[in-house]
């Protein structure tokens, strides 16, 4: 994972269908320019303005490019659950802030059998990051609200929480194939799928 923080995830939630369509076209063309032209012209993003289509495409491309070639190739045979989990993985790999929120807050709660995320959990996390991350120091209240709103929508659409209202934690169910793809990439990302250290060691013994 890149050590820098990127907050442009506010431009697009999980966008499961749209991201999958982009990946399919990229695997067909093997060329980002051709993929972009198709996606914009066919309005895969389902946005009225061309500028909005381009903005969302840039964000989805950034996410897709974070995946390994092996992970991308697996989309050809992946189940709907695998597709969702791999697209969520792309988000975790792209946005350090989201990854850290899950590992530093959600995983700790989950391991303590506390299965509901409170607004105060997020607010405490955000405050702890606000003065450590340059991009957050002088953001507006509106941007701060949107960062939170879109983050929880991503978690909901990833089926990581039951809803943005209740925020009950749901541990993702990963296929053996996806577990192996993550382990061969970077086993640390399994933490964001709520794997314990013990479970991660077992995965490493099996696949690495």
Predicted regions and their residues:
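Accessory, usually C-terminal, subdomains that scaffold auxiliary metal cofactors
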Residues: 137-208
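Eukaryotic partner-binding/assembly regions in large regulatory complexes
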Residues: 1-85
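Leucine-rich, amphipathic alpha-helical/linker segments
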Residues: 9-12, 16-29, 91-92, 96, ...
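Amphipathic alpha-helical interaction surfaces
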Residues: 63-66, 104, 108, 128-132, ...
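Positively charged, polyanion-binding regions of nucleic-acid-associated proteins
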Residues: 86-89, 93-115
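DNA-recognition alpha helix
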Residues: 118-132
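Short capping segments at the starts of secondary-structure elements
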Residues: 30, 114-117
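Short, solvent-exposed secondary-structure capping/transition elements
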Residues: 69-73, 110-115, 133-136
């Amino acid at each position: 994972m890149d050590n820098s923080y990127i907050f442009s995830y506010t431009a697009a939630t999980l966008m499961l269908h749209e991201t999958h369509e982009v990946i399919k076209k990229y695997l067909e063309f093997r060329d980002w320019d051709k993929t972009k032209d198709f996606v914009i012209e066919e309005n895969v993003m389902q946005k009225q303005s061309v500028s909005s289509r381009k903005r969302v495409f840039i964000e989805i491309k950034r996410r897709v490019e974070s995946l390994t070639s092996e992970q991308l190739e697996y989309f050809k045979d992946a189940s709907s659950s695998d597709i969702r989990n791999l697209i969520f993985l792309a988000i975790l790999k792209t946005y350090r802030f989201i990854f850290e929120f899950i590992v530093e807050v959600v995983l700790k709660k989950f391991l303590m059998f506390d299965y509901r995320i409170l607004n105060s959990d997020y607010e405490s996390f955000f405050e702890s990051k606000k003065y450590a991350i340059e991009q957050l120091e002088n953001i507006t209240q509106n941007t701060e609200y949107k960062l939170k709103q879109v983050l929880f929508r991503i978690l909901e659409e990833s089926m990581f929480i039951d809803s943005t209202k209740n925020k009950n934690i749901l541990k993702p169910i990963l296929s053996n194939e996806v577990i192996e793809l993550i382990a061969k990439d970077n086993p640390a990302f399994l933490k964001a799928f709520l794997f314990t250290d013990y479970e991660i060691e077992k995965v490493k013994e099996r696949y690495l």
